[in-house]
């Protein structure tokens, strides 16, 4: 594993670009103080106490031109995010001053950090394991308080502790197998029986199954619930989107076909992050642009975790309504009867022949009635008994982790199959070792450089 001395000193802007109260430029590496002292006018930062904030100015040493008035936060290794020497320069927000300071840092010994490189160093230097490093990005991207709480639990190491406990259990079994193989002549050595190996495989598999039982909810919390709002034109889809978002994101008019494309937005519905997709009204049309929007709408239905099918309660069912009801029959859906503020003309008896009325919710987006009930129903559909968790309040949210847990589970099934077939214990232990290795990939106890490059490239600059 690389050590801090093998790394260049890196720098990046940690705050979003644009105007703001402050901007932060982060520097990390063994040459941090050599770089900063060349451009910082004030106290000698190489001598100040760690974890202090120091007032001063950034000055171009070549022109002696003052660039900005700043506060510099000094943090010495190893008690930093990267376990390297770190300085964070807080300057006035804005593109010009921030970029000028960054360029001075880069021209005096640092290089530009790659996306996620600060967190990558935290992993390589042993401050975080891989699952904790991934939780950093989950925390940044959290859309709801529930998402944030799950990410914080993972960052605190809850998942890591459980995985390492399982790996240690497996390692203990493998050690006993090795002793039994290497020293079969010693009667005092505890014999690893087929029964004992089977019991341990069953025990670990139960823990993995408990983790996997949280995966569905966890994936929703991490990635959001892809929710398609569909219906024929002018039934109130865009009005529903705007109401859920509490802002006018979609154009609302009486003209059918106004929404020509798919609009995507995230919204927090009682702790459930919904990735709302407002689709173009689905109907037969000769308009080329609208036709493209309709085709995208149909694709959105296929990709959705939840379909909100909006019908107009003030109009009789149309052939397009019936087609959409049939097309979404196998989808997880809620059928919304909108415009209940107007006289009802939709035949409820006919609707009952096409859909289970328990899936139907009446509402008037215009009068803001029924929206609370819609939010309650969505939350109940996916979190009926609240947030599931396994031992120690652990939830699995990451698709990579889910895949590795399934591979570990399969390896344990192979152990059971081998034992049932009467295979020698020394052969069965190969599958037990595979399980141990798959679990190790979750925490990064075993990894490939290509995996690290792929994971950390998804991070933002400065993190």
Swiss-Prot record:
> In which organism is this protein found?
Lactiplantibacillus plantarum (strain ATCC BAA-793 / NCIMB 8826 / WCFS1)
**CDD domains, from UniProt?**
trmE, TrmE_N
Assembly, in brief, is: Homodimer. Heterotetramer of two MnmE and two MnmG subunits.
Q: Where does the protein principally reside?
A: cytoplasm
Tell me where in this chain the TrmE-type G domain is found.
224-383
Query: So what EC number does this one have?
Result: 3.6.-.-
Q: Which NCBIfam families match?
A: mnmE_trmE_thdF, PRK05291.1-3, small_GTP
Binding sites annotated in the UniProt record for GTP: 234-239, 253-259, 278-281
Function per UniProt: Exhibits a very high intrinsic GTPase hydrolysis rate. Involved in the addition of a carboxymethylaminomethyl (cmnm) group at the wobble position (U34) of certain tRNAs, forming tRNA-cmnm(5)s(2)U34.
Q: Where does (6S)-5-formyl-5,6,7,8-tetrahydrofolate bind?
A: 26, 88, 127, 463
| Binding-site list for K(+) | 234, 253, 255, 258
Binding-site residues for Mg(2+), renumbered to this chain: 238, 259
Alphabetically sorted, this entry's keywords are: Cytoplasm, GTP-binding, Hydrolase, Magnesium, Metal-binding, Nucleotide-binding, Potassium, tRNA processing
**Which PANTHER family does the record match to this protein?**
TRNA MODIFICATION GTPASE GTPBP3, TRNA MODIFICATION GTPASE GTPBP3, MITOCHONDRIAL
State the needed cofactors, names only: K(+)
Please provide the Gene Ontology terms (biological process) for this protein.
tRNA methylation; tRNA wobble uridine modification
Query: Can you say what this protein is called?
Result: tRNA modification GTPase MnmE
Textual note on the cofactor: Binds 1 potassium ion per subunit.
GO cellular component terms, alphabetically, are:
cytosol
Return the HAMAP family for the record: GTPase_MnmE
Report if keyword Heme is assigned: no
The protein's location, in the record's own words, is: Cytoplasm
Q: Which gene encodes it?
A: mnmE
